[in-house]
UniProtKB/Swiss-Prot annotation:
The lineage of its organism: Eukaryota, Fungi, Dikarya, Ascomycota, Saccharomycotina. This is Inclusion body clearance protein IML2. It comes from Candida glabrata (strain ATCC 2001 / BCRC 20586 / JCM 3761 / NBRC 0622 / NRRL Y-65 / CBS 138) (Yeast). Inclusion body (IB) resident protein that interacts strongly with lipid droplet (LD) proteins. Involved in LD-mediated IB clearing after protein folding stress, probably by enabling access to the IBs of an LD-stored soluble sterol derivative that acts as a chaperone in inclusion clearing. The keyword Kinase does not apply. It is found in: Cytoplasm; Nucleus.
Amino acid sequence: MFKVFGALSGKGSSDSNGNSTRSSINEKRTKLILKEANDFEIALRAMDYVLDDRTEEGLALLRENEKVNGQNQTITVLARGVIEFLQATLSFEMEEIKNASNTLAKAEQLSWKSRTEAQKSGIRNSSIYPPGTVYAVTYTESCLLHALLMLFTESMMDAAKALLKLRKAYSMLHEIMEVVKKSELSRKVSSSSAVSIQSNGSFVSEEATFVSADIPYQLSETESNDPELWAFAEKIYKMRKLRLSGAHIGNTPAISRLRSGLGLSASNKSEELANSEQSVLSDEAAERQATIDEFIHSGVNLCYGILQVVLSLIPPAIGAVLSIVGFRGSREEGLRLIWKATKDRNVHGCIGLLGLMFYYDGPFQFTDVDFDIPPALSNTKTSDSDTDRDGSISIDEMDGHALLHPGPILEEALLHARALFPNSALWLLNEARMLSSRGRLPEAIELLDSIDVESIHMRQVKGLLVFDKAITLVHMQEYERAATNLLSLLKISDWSHAFYTYFAGCCYLENWRMAQMGFIKDDKLEFYREKAEELIFSAPKLLGKKTFKSKNLPLDRFMLRKVEQFKATQKKLGVKNILDAIGTSPIREITYFYNGYNRMSKSDLEIAQKMLTSYHNPAIDQHDPDQELIKNLLLSLTMRRLGDVESGVKLLDEKVLPSIYYMQNGKVKYIKKTEDPWAYPTALYERALFTWKLDGVDNLSECRHWLVTAQNYAGDYELSTRVGMKIKAALDRVEESLQHGTA
């Protein structure tokens, strides 16, 4: 495309028939601009096929385009890279990470070349942004996604390279963001259709007039009456219109599937909406928006937003270094930008929504439901967020509290995605996660059971869905079913066969204990015992056989340490049955890692409390200080979730915290322990939550004290990243509230 840009910009043209030459050049320029918009629409369509669990159709579409344009077209290579990035981040498998990294590296190079050539030519493909802007966006998108993949490998060399890429992306995104902000202001000033007609390409015939948003200038009289140009421009308009309605990948218009709420029992929207073929699931002005402009601002919002959120969650030791070299992340600004990206009906909006759902409702849940700190001080104690309960707050109006508790806005966005991509289990999985985060566990399982796992084409999504189903079943204490699902992952996913096996063994162990306690029938008691022993103690043998990293995963290292502890306890006590050498239930620990205590029902919490306090074996009865610490930590937060906050904090203060720190001359002194390193900063984090539940905003300064104390319990241990990010997210919310309250 760019080989002819020099001629199209008027450089080097000296034809004696000036007007004819100019007309010919203008027509070629217009055709190329339309072709570029067409290629972007094809790429957007291909990526949407993947989001509808039809990866092969998406890749086939890209291959067809490559037959015409070759294998070095920037947007096609980026689209392939985005598809491979999604596959890699859903599976975390090394081979897929390598493939995606190679493709994104190529997309970076092509984007830089395309941007440079577009700037030299001076030809505008946008009425809003300067030449080359769209390729600045493809460059930063390639950089950002590539850097994230590098960080996933946990290689020191790759991490250093990733920081350089993030720096490049950060600098360019900041520059583009300023252009985007200026364009948004100018659009607010002049957004009338009359202006649009004058500034965009208008085609005229005796019967009709058609305005193409994709041509950012007025057409000559010859072009305006060119039927070939008209047909091409109208084709792109129709492609965009079909994409906005969700009908571009062969599905009926998405509005016909839009439901009123979560879960299988939710009804569809009104017949009137369902029968409207013209309805779209985005802004009314979207059809009149140029494809290139849409790609630019949605891409910038997504990439800059993700970068800001990631930087805001980085532990302080690394964050301090990054801030010195110019990196600064704002969680609130980042979330707001990602929310803006979701307004666009394209892959950027979908990736943004997936990121938001992981942030709000994912297994780790960075916004702890027990820590619902508002963005500013008030005189009220904690209460459930009433932000946007009627769905009346728009994304543009979201303040700090709404960003923390998006409520119906997030639900509505997910329901739109479910309607747009009815064939994809990825969106069904996220709906189940949302139900689970709201404590609607049986409905989540019902939804997950509604799809035949074997019908899912994307192996990565299949693995995620089965794992999430297992976690949800664990929260419901249906351990045998959970174990069956976990073991089935050995044939689906290469992520960590060792942890899957250990996790399944812990499920059988808890069933064995519950059968002994009379919570379930004891007719399979011996089966549970045999399976627990077999799986827990065979898991370490699987390390390194099915892992995507050069070193063991954090949960692999956690599992290995626990198994070694059990063996050491058996040797110390001399017990014949090795299961009697296991103290505090390991499944209760894993339940905490996946946010189970915030999701369990009252009856399941009561069973958990009973199992923690009333089950006995030789390992438990020796009252080992380390096992007692974990038991009392888990018991205290179980009590808090059951509403007995006073008893919970008393237990934590008296039985847990004295083993972790003490005060000396007004300063915190840590008791460094290594037996279960995740538990020590976690206990301090949970103490901050207790203060919040007891005193609300009246004692946010003490909340901050506990969170700072937790954060400063520094150490590189197997789950330090997960625990550290959770602590930092809470500390940021507390500090924001304190700052706003004293302003």
